[in-house]
Amino acid sequence: MKSKLLILCVFFSVGANAYTCSGKVKGVSIEAKTGDVLVESIGPLSWPRLCKVDSEYDGISPEACRIVYSTLLTAQSTGKDVTLWFNDSKDCSAASHPSWQWLTGWYFGPKLSV
């Protein structure tokens, strides 16, 4: 019984810190001097800095970043929503993810809506 309760607590503690941010994509861009991918908006997120197309950053390779960039361009041009997954204790607010700063806690996505 105690082991079942422990497992249940672990699942709840992991789930309590996970969240998603979803929405339309607008203004996909690359900062010319740094290679940083920025987006004017991804749903509620304003000007998040996601990754670098020319070097690894926070475990994201340039190749993976180019796929992220391509997915965001596809979402922007088709008007489809995307979803990003996070595993920190924040939310999708501007207070949690200030404009022009690197996204924290982002671990999966963008996933293009069907």
Residue ranges, per PLM feature:
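Sec-dependent signal peptide recognition
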Residues: 2-8
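N-terminal signal peptide c-region/cleavage motif recognized by signal peptidases
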Residues: 13-15
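Exposed beta-strand/loop interface patches that mediate assembly or binding
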Residues: 19-114
